[in-house]
A protein has these predicted regions:
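N-proximal low-complexity "stem/linker" segments adjacent to membrane-targeting elements
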Residues: 1-26
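Glycine-rich, basic loop-to-helix element that forms the pyrophosphate-binding segment
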Residues: 63-80
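Short aromatic/hydrophobic "clamp" motif used to bind/position activated sugar donors
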Residues: 85
Length: 168
């Protein structure tokens, strides 16, 4: 499987956490990725220089005004080239084989979208909560949506059917 995955990272404030998020996307075992960081903080002008990670797969977009995370994601989707869109918040990290395993699952099961389990750590790295992906039907998903956006991969063509997939 060599389909391009576009990783959309909206950013507002913490450069240190953003660098870690970018590196967790760049260090995936699945290498055919583009990472699009949408800088939603107009007071930070040269985010690429602050991040200081040189990689041809990394692209920065600067919002002229604060749009919020949702509209920043839409902007990233619109500038993406991948068949798949993956979301990664600027304070989240992925395990190294996250994209590979999830894409293989999607291919095997003919899915257009999927999400995974995840856990939450506190500032000292202790796991404080675990969220497990469950097989859910549409009704149960609507009633109790506990999907971490940073676990989602979806085909771009599905997202493009929605005019603005992320409201603010």
């Amino acid at each position: 499987m060599k389909n391009l995955v576009s990783v959309i990272i909206p950013f507002y404030s913490n450069i240190t956490l953003l660098k870690k998020s970018i590196l967790s996307a760049l260090n995936q075992t699945y290498k055919n990725v583009e990472i699009i960081v949408v800088n939603d903080n107009p007071s930070i002008k040269k985010i690429d220089e602050l991040v200081n990670i040189k990689n041809k797969r990394l692209k920065f977009i600067n919002n002229k005004v604060n749009l919020g995370a949702g509209l920043s994601r839409n902007k990233g989707i619109n500038s993406s080239k991948g068949k798949y869109i993956a979301f990664l918040d600027s304070d989240d990290l992925w395990k190294k084989n996250k994209l590979y395993l999830q894409l293989m699952f999607m291919k095997k099961n003919r899915c257009v979208a999927s999400h995974t389990s995840y856990y939450i750590k506190n500032s000292v790295g202790k796991i404080i909560s675990k969220r497990y992906a469950k097989n859910q039907n549409y009704q149960s998903l609507i009633k109790s949506c506990d999907i971490g956006l940073s676990t989602v991969i979806i085909e771009k063509k599905v997202l493009k059917k929605l005019k603005y997939p992320f409201p603010n």
